[in-house]
Amino acid sequence: MAGALSLRCRTGCTGGCEYGHKGKCRDSSLLSKRLSEDSSRHQLLQKWTSMWRSTSEDASVADTEKARLEEAAAAAEERPLVFLCSGCRRPLGDSLSWVTSQEDTNCILLRCVSCNVSVDKEQKLSKREKENGCILETLHCTGCSLNLGYVYRCTPKNLDYKRDLFCLNVEAVESYVLGSSEKQIVSEDKELFNLESRVEIEKSLKQMEDVLQALQMKLWEVESKLSFATCKS
């Protein structure tokens, strides 16, 4: 009898255990419940961890892409400028010899220029405001003879930083960023339409139109003959 009661207690005593196993059974039930709760919490924790890792990976990818774009933008900003003559687009110099720019005189100052810039040896005094005492030599483009600006040969003490610098008028200069061109060679199967191809296409369309008109006339003649034969019969 005792063995049977003991067996009943092991298999699931509720509240009427007569042999002192009531507390043990309750402890077992609480333990199972806590284990179940811990398992649920563990699963939830794993789920959150997975979501966090996914979010972190997405953020890492986004940060990597952002860094790449910032590097590309920085590289674009560091690309040198080539200054071209606005008349014939010959290169006059580049930003590697850049010194400064002056908004009041609307010009840029370079340490050196290309061989496309000729210097007139005839010297003259500057007539610009605040440049009294400056001796200038005129700059011209060797290609189109456009007046590009001046080179300062003699300056007062307060303008010593301009001496032997080439002052190019902004209106006479255009700029080009090295590496900014994205033009690619077009393959034969993707060749763009030009004037000759357009003429050929228009010619082919005209021939097709003439053929269609001739077929329409023949069809009209056949229909007329059939209609006449029907009326006669």
Curated annotation (Swiss-Prot):
Q: Which domain of life is it from?
A: Eukaryota
The UniProt entry, under PROSITE patterns, shows:
MIS18
Cell location? Nucleus; Chromosome; Chromosome, Centromere
User: Residues involved in crosslink (Glycyl lysine isopeptide (Lys-Gly) (interchain with G-Cter in SUMO2))?
Assistant: K162
Where along this sequence does the record place binding of Zn(2+)? C85, C88, C141, C144
Phosphoserine occurs at S36, S39, S40, S233
**What keywords appear on the UniProt entry?**
Cell cycle, Cell division, Centromere, Chromosome, Isopeptide bond, Metal-binding, Mitosis, Nucleus, Phosphoprotein, Ubl conjugation, Zinc
- Pfam families recorded for this chain? Yippee-Mis18
A molecular function GO annotation: metal ion binding
Q: Which residues form the Mis18 domain?
A: 80-178
Q: What is its main location?
A: nucleus
- Provide the GO biological process annotations: cell division; CENP-A containing chromatin assembly; chromosome segregation
Q: Which terms in the GO cellular component ontology are assigned?
A: chromatin; chromosome, centromeric region; nucleus
Q: Explain the purpose of this protein.
A: Required for recruitment of CENPA to centromeres and normal chromosome segregation during mitosis.
The family note in this entry says: Belongs to the mis18 family.
* Assembly information from the UniProt record: Homodimer, and heterodimer with OIP5/MIS18B. Identified in a complex containing MIS18A, OIP5/MIS18B, MIS18BP1, RBBP7 and RBBP4.
In terms of PANTHER family, this protein maps to: NEUROGENIC PROTEIN MASTERMIND (PTHR16431), PROTEIN MIS18-ALPHA (PTHR16431:SF2)
Protein name as annotated: Protein Mis18-alpha
What gene does this protein come from?
MIS18A
